[in-house]
Amino acid sequence: MNEKKEFKPYIPADKVMPELTVTSVIIGVLLAILFGGANAYLGLRVGMTVSASIPAAVISMGIIRFILRRDSILENNMVQTIGSAGESVAAGAIFTLPALFMWAQEEGTAMPSLVEIALIALIGGFLGVLFMIPLRSALIVQEHGVLPYPEGQACAEVLVAGEEGGAKAGTVFAGLGIAAVYKFIADGLKVFPSEVDFTIKPYKGSAVGADVLPALLGVGYICGPKVSSYLLAGGSVAWFMIMPLIALFGGDNIIGPALIPVSQMSPSQIWSNYVRYIGAGAVAAGGILSLIKSLPLIVRTFKQALKGYGKKADGVESRLTKDIPMMFVVLGIGVLAIIMWLIPAIPVNLLSAIIIIIFGFFFATVSSRMVGLVGSSNNPVSGMAIATLLISSAILKATGAVGMKGMVAAISIGSVICIIAAIAGDTSQDLKTGYIVGATPYKQQAGELIGVAVSAITVGGVLYLLNAAWGYGSTELPAPQATLMKMVVEGVMGNSLPWSLVFAGVAIAIVVEILQIPVLPFAVGLYLPIYLSTPIMVGGLVRLYFDKKKGITEEERKTKVNQGILYSSGLIAGEGLVGILLAVFAIIPVGAATLGDAINISKIINLGNIGGLVFFACLVATLVAFINKKEKKTK
């Protein structure tokens, strides 16, 4: 207890600095749009998103301190608070909402409107922030030293080391620029294929390849060798064990859900017709298993949170203890419940809206404590979403809400809960950063609400754009989580799934759990095409080399690893931005074709698979070069 009372933030309570300013809001909003769009594209492509807090903080320092010549750590903290909200809204939205687009495509129903998507994202995002306001004291302040909030602490360290911000921001922008040019050459000009693949003729049913893209290299480096290897292990089991066995035993038989004989199928068709259902079962089981393993922690968290609900750290009211007033929080939650009840975008009655509020608060509490202990990347949001969808689908079916209407309602409810969990986790990391650097809580909470509002309005446009360009469930945008959530709802509502394949995936997940291997990354690798796992593994191997490199001090190792993380963040952002730009090109008509077709020069220059591998090797070399780059000390 003494340790908590004696904690002194970087900026003391009696010192007032610029914080929620016009500058911080404008830069934060721009970064929220940037990282929200980039993460939406990344998540729809590979089923993973990355935290935007640290790159947003670094870019902010580069702009505010070194371009605008202003010096306020709290202003920089506000920028990363607003900016990281974009990534979290995108993460919650892409897990579920693309299912509505896929149904519209398959069943001929109406597409969800931009207003409906914005309302779902706004309600989920606002609730996620509002739930965290009374929990801040209990989880962030009173549990300081108990809940580490790793990303929050890391971001605070970056902010405190602000004098290095200029050089670090340059690393992020370099990654962004290189990835943007690379992506444009690969998927815009199509000088070389971004997916290189090789069939193994003697080993029928199998194939190997890689999506040689910057974002995947960056994801692998940031996730590290362990997570990358689990993903590749899952992919290897699918593509080198399960698929060849299906090809061997399937023969000339037509086995549902496929409509042609197995012998006539390519490896991709075998994956699409059979393996993705096995993978879906494994991912669903992995999400639920992670939730079950967390149950003791969830119960303990809930008890402690209710006990300390809204309690101040001490009796003294100061700048550092001021939250948004509780009256505003309660009123806001009540208004959002009424809006859910009244708007057609979320087709629920008042009782269901109240149930969403109760479940939402429960999952917000769980999400916050989970990220506090194990970090945002290990937060079982997919498990919470699956649990919500199973419960809501079962309730809707029991009350007669079946067919497409019931399925849309289930996904809408699941979307709100998913966004609540994602935003609550992000908000708690940001509030921990603010607690360490000495930010004013109510200003940070207001910043989160601004970031959520902007991101909710823009995420619908991004989803529409990407769907119009390539369509969800395509090779370009497989939308793995949303496809899984769609399958879960269809399975409960219509019994339309090939359950034997799904349960085979569940069995694999249970075996993996018994072997004490983390189930979710393995299951995601099983579910996704192996082309995504291989470049991620390359990034993981680069990280492993520098994690284990001999002949350097621990301080040098930490510096090199962090430089790689910043450069990798730039790679992810750069590819995401050009991916969205190319989506715009794909729908702009030029004569009888599109602008995307007009810039395609593959008939003039096409370097083929070998060219793709050479370009990717050069990209890996740039990552290594930036990791080894000597840091310039700026004063």
Identify the meaning behind each predicted range.
Residues 1-635:
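Alpha-helical multipass membrane-protein architecture
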